[in-house]
Regions:
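C-terminal motif of bacterial Sec signal peptides marking the signal peptidase cleavage site
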Residues: 16-19
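Aromatic-lined substrate-binding rim segments of carbohydrate-active enzymes
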Residues: 96-159, 166-171, 175, 215-217, ...
Length: 352
């Protein structure tokens, strides 16, 4: 009996140990599941509350300017193609992760975040600065998430001379460049369209005060500088370029208005060694409305492609105008079908 009792005791011990092993395995599995759920929740929270200053970015995506060309970090020429938002204060809902991902699917590799300075609810005229900067942070985050570049655009327009709000610009770009210092996918556009008689000397003076503030935080980032006459007079910049590396010069066109003369001005400036970036264009007339001219637009695209000139199309909105990409009757902010697109939207999707 003692022999059998010993055997029974041993069997009981084996069963207890096995039970404990199963319990420990179940606890480990449960903890792993909880850890996975926590990670997903944390990731979701981080996605909804972008923190660009701490985000992980692809440091191989850095850009530099070599001669008149935009190049990758290895010095090979690149051509960015993408889309500009309309005013962030007026059409903020398009800055969302699904929309930016969809534009990437169209073939876009850059998104321009247009923040008006002087117009209604502009950054310098009563707009909510914290909300506008938060939209820029989100736009940069979503662009980085989709391996795209983001242009932070100080959208000078009705004030004409960027020196009007120079102090605000200096503060803004100092803050933004500090926040995005580790992100090589951020490009700074420091004055959209100097106009109303503003000279290149005035723009030059302004840029000489703003660029060093960006360089203090982000020494290698690409900076785009607007040119006089609604960013058409690149020829004047070509005769007196700024004394900084990795600086490009904006040329803007609207294909139904601007034809061979402006195209020739672009190619001549490039031939003189000026790095040109078409940071805004449309295929209608210069008002942003009116008739579409696809024939002229296609000639422009051919000219830009032949010189590897990067270009950004205006605009991501459903505003009732020819330059909007989305029909005025469409209230979606992502998941667009071809039926939701305007003629310019359909054209751009084909081109990209």
């Amino acid at each position: 009996m003692k022999k059998y009792a010993g055997i029974m005791i041993c069997m009981a011990l084996v069963m207890v140990l096995a039970s404990c092993g199963r319990k420990n395995a179940q606890q480990s599995s449960s903890k792993a599941q909880q850890a996975s759920q926590t990670t997903l929740q944390t990731t979701s929270q981080q996605s909804s509350q972008p923190q660009p200053s701490s985000q992980t970015v692809n440091n191989t995506k850095g850009l530099k300017v070599v001669g008149s060309r935009l190049c990758d970090s290895k010095g090979d020429p690149v051509q960015l193609k993408g889309i500009s938002t309309h005013g962030l204060a007026w059409f903020p809902d398009y800055v969302n992760p699904d929309c930016i991902k969809e534009l990437k699917g169209w073939g876009a590799d850059v998104i321009r975040l247009a923040m008006y300075t002087s117009e209604y609810n502009g950054y310098c005229t009563g707009g909510n600065r914290d909300q506008l900067k938060d939209l820029i942070r989100k736009g940069v985050q979503y662009a980085s998430d989709n391996d795209m570049y983001a242009i932070v655009d100080w959208h000078v327009l009705s004030e004409g001379d960027p020196n009007v709000y120079k102090e605000e610009a200096k503060s803004f770009f100092s803050e933004m460049s500090r926040e995005f210092a580790s992100n090589p996918q951020v490009i700074y556009e420091i004055c959209n369209e100097p106009c109303n008689g503003t000279s290149w000397d005035a723009v030059y003076s302004y840029a000489n005060e703003v660029i060093p503030l960006i360089r203090a935080n982000s020494p290698d980032s690409v900076i785009i500088v607007g040119t006089p006459n609604w960013s058409q007079d690149v020829d004047k910049a070509a005769l007196k370029p700024l004394p900084y590396e990795n600086v490009m010069y904006a040329l803007h066109f609207y294909a139904a208005t601007h034809k061979g003369d402006l195209m020739d001005k672009m190619t001549s400036a490039i031939d003189l060694g000026l790095p040109v970036f078409v940071s805004e264009f449309g295929i209608c007339d210069a008002s942003g409305n009116g008739a579409i001219d696809e024939s002229s637009a296609n000639k422009w695209v051919d000219a830009m492609n032949s010189r590897k000139v990067s270009y950004v199309c205006w605009n991501l909105s459903n505003k009732a105008e020819s330059s909007a990409l989305i029909k005025n009757t469409c209230n979606k902010t992502s998941g667009f079908t071809d039926e939701d697109l305007t003629p310019e939207g359909k054209w751009l999707k084909r081109v990209l």
